[in-house]
C-alpha cells in the first residue's frame, strides 16, 4: 500500500492498495460514515435505439463518491466492496442520492475522507504501508507422504494442500521408495516456489519426515535451506500449523508478522485466564471499566468489533495512557477464541475491584 496524497487538516487520504493484505487492512480502516471516492463501473441504460443494448445497458467507468453504509471483505475471493449513497458523480449517468457499491481494486487509487482519523486508524494505515515492504513466511507441515502449506498473510493463514506423494509405508530402503520420496519432496518444493519473495520457511511436523526433507533441500535446494528452520509439532495438517503459530516460532523469524503476533497475544491472554489472574478483563463491560480506570496495559479487540459504539475513542484512550492496542483478525483461531470472550479483552497493569 502506498499513500499518494494526504491532507491531515481535511482528513483526506488518497492511497493505492497493492496486495490482498492491503484490501484486508482497508476493510477495517474504512468505517460507516466515511466518504470514499474511486473509479467504478456501472451498467447504464443505453437509449440509442438498439433494443438488445438498451435491455442490458452498457458498462461505463467513471469516478464517484459515496458515503459508506456497509463494508464487506470476502477473504476467499479477495473482494472488498463498499456500499453507500452517491454524493458526487456524473449526474447524466447516475442519480445523486441513489445507492451504489464500489469494488475496491488493486492498483487503483481510492480517496478516504473521515471527520476525524482516530489514532488506531492512522496506526493501522502505517502498519499496512510498512508491512507491504516486508516479505512473507511459509510453514511447510510434513507428515509421511502428505504436506500442507500455511502462507502467512496479514489477514490470516492461507492454506495450500494437501500435497500428496506416493511413498510406500514400508520402512525399507530401496531404489523405488527413494525415488518416490524425492518425487514427493520435489512436488512440495515446486508448490513452495510458486510463492515469490518468501523470506522465512518453517519446516515442521510430528515425525522425522521434516528432518529428512530439510536434509534434502540442504543438498538439492540450498537457497531454500538457507531460509529454513525445523520445528516439531504433535499433529499434522492445519492443526500442526496452528501449533507452530502458538509457539511463536514465526514471530521470532518475522517479528512484524501480524498473524503470529496476534496468536501469541491471544495465547498469553488465555494463559492469564487459565491462572485465574486478577490482571485480566474480558467482555465489553469489564474491559470498558478497565479502560476508564486507566488500568489497561494491552487491549485486544476483534476486528469486527472496532466499528461498534464508541470503540474507536476507547482505543484512543488506551493509547493516550501509554497502553498498547492490538486489533485481532477474526480470520484465524485466535480471533475465534477472542470472539468467545466477548470480542474484547485486556491485560491489566494492576488488579481492579
Swiss-Prot record:
Its EC number is 3.1.-.-. Transmembrane segments: none annotated. One of its GO terms (biological process) is ribosome disassembly. SUPFAM superfamilies: Dom34/Pelota N-terminal domain-like, L30e-like, Translational machinery components. Keywords: Cytoplasm, Endonuclease, Hydrolase, Metal-binding, Nuclease. It is an enzyme of class 3 (hydrolase). It is found in: Cytoplasm. One of its GO terms (cellular component) is cytoplasm. Its cofactor is a divalent metal cation. One of its GO terms (molecular function) is endonuclease activity. Monomer. May function in recognizing stalled ribosomes, interact with stem-loop structures in stalled mRNA molecules, and effect endonucleolytic cleavage of the mRNA. May play a role in the release non-functional ribosomes and degradation of damaged mRNAs. Has endoribonuclease activity. This is Protein pelota homolog. It comes from Methanobrevibacter smithii (strain ATCC 35061 / DSM 861 / OCM 144 / PS).
Amino acid at each position: 500500500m502506498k499513500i499518494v496524497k494526504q491532507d491531515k487538516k481535511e482528513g483526506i487520504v488518497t492511497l493505492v492498495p497493492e496486495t490482498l493484505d492491503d484490501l484486508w487492512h482497508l476493510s477495517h480502516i474504512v468505517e460507516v460514515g466515511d466518504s470514499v471516492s474511486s473509479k467504478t463501473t456501472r451498467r447504464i441504460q443505453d437509449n440509442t435505439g438498439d433494443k438488445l443494448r438498451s435491455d442490458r445497458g452498457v458498462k461505463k467507468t467513471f469516478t464517484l463518491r459515496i458515503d459508506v453504509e456497509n463494508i464487506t471483505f470476502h477473504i476467499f475471493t479477495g473482494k472488498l466492496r463498499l456500499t453507500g449513497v452517491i454524493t458526487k458523480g456524473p449526474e447524466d449517468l447516475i442519480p445523486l442520492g441513489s445507492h451504489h457499491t464500489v469494488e475496491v481494486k488493486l492498483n487503483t487509487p481510492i480517496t478516504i475522507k473521515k471527520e476525524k482519523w482516530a489514532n488506531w486508524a492512522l496506526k493501522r494505515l502505517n502498519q499496512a504501508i510498512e508491512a507491504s515492504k516486508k516479505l512473507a513466511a511459509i510453514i511447510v507441515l510434513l507428515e509421511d507422504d502428505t504436506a500442507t502449506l500455511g502462507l502467512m498473510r496479514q489477514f490470516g493463514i492461507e492454506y495450500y494442500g494437501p500435497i500428496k506423494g506416493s511413498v510406500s509405508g514400508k520402512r525399507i530402503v530401496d531404489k523405488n521408495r527413494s525415488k518416490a520420496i524425492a518425487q514427493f519432496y520435489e512436488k512440495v518444493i515446486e508448490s513452495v516456489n510458486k510463492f515469490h519473495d518468501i523470506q522465512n520457511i518453517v519446516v515442521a511436523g510430528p515425525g522425522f519426515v521434516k528432518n529428512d526433507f530439510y536434509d534434502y533441500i540442504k543438498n538439492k535446494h540450498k537457497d531454500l535451506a538457507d531460509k529454513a528452520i525445523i520445528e516439531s509439532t504433535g499433529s499434522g495438517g492445519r492443526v500442526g500449523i496452528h501449533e507452530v503459530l502458538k509457539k511463536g516460532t514465526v514471530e521470532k523469524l518475522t517479528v512484524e508478522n501480524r498473524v503470529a503476533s496476534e496468536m501469541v497475544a491471544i495465547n498469553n491472554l488465555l494463559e492469564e485466564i487459565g491462572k485465574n489472574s486478577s490482571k485480566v478483563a474480558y467482555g465489553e463491560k469489564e474491559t470498558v471499566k478497565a479502560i476508564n480506570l486507566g488500568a489497561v496495559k494491552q487491549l485486544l479487540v476483534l476486528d469486527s468489533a472496532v466499528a461498534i459504539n464508541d470503540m474507536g475513542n476507547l482505543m484512543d484512550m488506551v493509547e493516550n495512557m501509554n497502553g498498547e492496542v492490538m486489533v485481532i483478525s477474526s480470520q484465524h483461531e485466535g480471533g475465534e477464541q477472542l470472539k468467545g470472550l466477548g470480542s474484547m479483552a485486556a491485560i491489566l497493569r494492576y488488579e481492579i475491584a
